[in-house]
Structure formats: structure tokens, C-alpha cells
């Protein structure tokens, strides 16, 4: 069984609105999106975030006339920018502030590099850190609450995970912070969408085709996403995790079976070379006679160090 393909099929059904049934009592995603937009405008007005220079399509215009596929009537097509604040460590912050002199395992705030971001999971970093004081100076690229992280350059381009926010961390180069404007979106749903074949196709389709492929923050903001009602997002995530857990069990079972098969083969060979796999037949020609026929000059040697063989 191709469990990788099975996982992708589950994600494909999920993002098409076919994994769980729709509930007519759910608040439509169009209303949800307006709530999120209002929260975004509040954050901009309070100066907590800045409006991007190249803003995505205005909320006053219809979204995506050429949508990738049809979604249930309670869903809506949108993009990352209308749901998340997207930023990275600015170049001057890295060259001026994050230097060999300021990075040490003895500091308080771990920095998050591309190697800490794997597709679907976060790898905690304990080797490099900056001081709390320096992190406070670079508040924009600090990691203080749950958000998505995406590698935007190099071999792992498009790898996305959820930052668990167990402690304050800080962005290093090559990783984008994708922070929700509101708690009215399930981060796990957004993660699963970006992990799907369609989500990854979108990432690869907009990456710059150079020797070292890369994504700009503007292109990440433009990534399309099919948004279900919030209650349905939760149901989708619960169903995905239930099915993925079953696949994990299948994969573990396959691994255990392969181990058993390998051990069994080894045991069979061990029994065979010790003369214990099949019974000896007294009518068989002794092996010493066979050797004499193969090599007439053969002289048997009684080596006390050799194991005793079957008679």
C-alpha cells in the first residue's frame, strides 16, 4: 500500500469539501472572511501591522474569477494575505544584528532556521539563540504565538509547519512567518491545505526558477486557499488526524512485518548452516565422500576450534 499517496488522497478530498459533510447551520465562510478582514483592519489601524505595499486583490472585488476548482457553496476562495500577516527577517536585521557575536547557545531566545521547518512538523532548536534584549529590538520577526512557518529559499522551499509557541523564538533567514490576524481560522486546516498536492503545486508554480529557487513574501501572500466555515475546518482537521493515525499504524505494521521477515530469513539461514533446518538421512552419502570425489587430494582435518557438525 502506497501510504504517501493515501495521505495525499485524504488531503485532496479535504480541500475539495468531500471529506466531511457540510452543515447548513455553519456560519458561511464568506461571513467568516469578513470578520477576519475586520480584525486585519483593526491591527493596521492600531499600528501593530503594516499594510503590504503590493496588496492582494481588494476585498471589494470578487475573489478569483478563475478558481482552481469548485468548492461547496458555504466555502469561499481567498488568499494567504487576507488571512495571515506574512513577514521575514529583514536583511539589515540579519547583517547588523544576528552575527557570530550575538548568536550563542547560552542566550535565551532560540533562532529558527530552515532546518527547523519540516513539512508538517517543527524541529526544536537548542543550539543557537540570541539575547532577550536583542529579540525585543526586532519585534517584527519575533515568534511569540502560534503561527505557520514556511521555508522560502533552498532545497526545502515550501516546507511548512506550525510553530508551537512553547517559548519565545526568533526568525533567522530563509523562513517566513505566516501569522493569523484572528483565531477564527484553524491553523491545522491551513497547514494541511499547504501540505496537499494542490497547495504544493501553488508554491512550486510561483517560486522563482533559479539555481536556488525562492519565494518572495508577495508571492506567499498571493497563494490561493479554499476556506471552509470555521466549524467545518475543525471537523476536517479531526477527520484528517483520525485517518492519518490509522495510516501511521499501517506504516508501523509494515515496518514491524519487514523486521519480522528479515529476522525470520536470518533465522532460517542460521538453522540451515547448522544442519538444523531439515533432518539428516542416514542413507545420504557423507559429505566427506562428496569432497573426496570433488577433490581426490582432499585430506580431512580435525580442527578442535571448529564447531561440532551433524554426523
Model-inferred region functions:
Residues 45, 63, 76-119, 134-138, ...:
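Low-complexity, Lys/Gly-biased intrinsically disordered segments
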Residues 69, 136-137, 209:
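Short, solvent-exposed loop/turn positions at domain surfaces
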Residues 4, 15, 75-76, 186, ...:
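Amphipathic alpha-helical segments
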Residues 142-143:
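Residue-level "contact hotspot" at macromolecular interaction interfaces
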Residues 153, 168-176, 185-188, 208-228:
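A short glycine-rich beta-alpha junction/loop motif
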Residues 93-95, 117-130, 148-172, 187-192, ...:
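Short, ligand-facing micro-motifs at secondary-structure edges
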Residues 1-24, 30-31, 41, 49, ...:
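Short amphipathic coiled-coil heptad-repeat segments
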Residues 9, 18, 64-94, 222, ...:
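Non-catalytic DNA-recognition/assembly elements of restriction-modification systems
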